[in-house]
Amino acid sequence: NPDGAVMYGAEQVVSRVAGSGNQAGDQANPVMAMLDGGGYVVAYTDTSGLDGNGYGIFARRYDANDNPLGDPFQVNLTGLHTQDEPAVVRLSGGGFAVVWTSNDYLVDNSGDGVFMRRYLADGSPAPEGEVLVNTSISGNQYQPAVSQSQDGGFIVAWYSDGERDGSYYDVFFQRFDASGNKLGIETRASTPVPVNPYIAEYEPAIALLNDSSGDFVIT
């Protein structure tokens, strides 16, 4: 509760599939977001090969009383290679969006890319399906972070090792509207610096300012 007291004392196994016991492999990197009505969603990386090939991104919804709303479900549509580093954000209208890193070079065409999938308030996937977030495909795109924006959309940030414009690692972001459409193209958040193995910008985080401006901060 707001005072820090435990309201529901028993821990739960998020990644267990009903009727089949514990999943094989590891379930790691859990992230969660609160949803409308007091419920929440947990997303994580599954290493058992349930998505057909290597690591996959799965999620599970819960109501306000910690009751699971169905079994865990697969988020990524592309099952080739590794999907990892999930992040999740609550959206206006009761839905949510999951972002992650994929090293399926056949989709991004160059190393790792950042992908997004949006879900509606009832937990059903939005019609746009799996979306490639990054515009540039130079090098790899890693460690996505995501935040809701004041206009009902959301912002995804990540870092790239593509050495663009003479820089080494750089942080970029992409804005989306409430329907999952891109608003413009990706934007560099970090200041370009000469290529130097000892200078890099990575591990981004996003915060929406607690005012009516709609401004946000990326670190």
Where are these regions (language model features)?
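Extracellular, repeat-based ectodomains that mediate carbohydrate processing or recognition
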Residues: 1-219
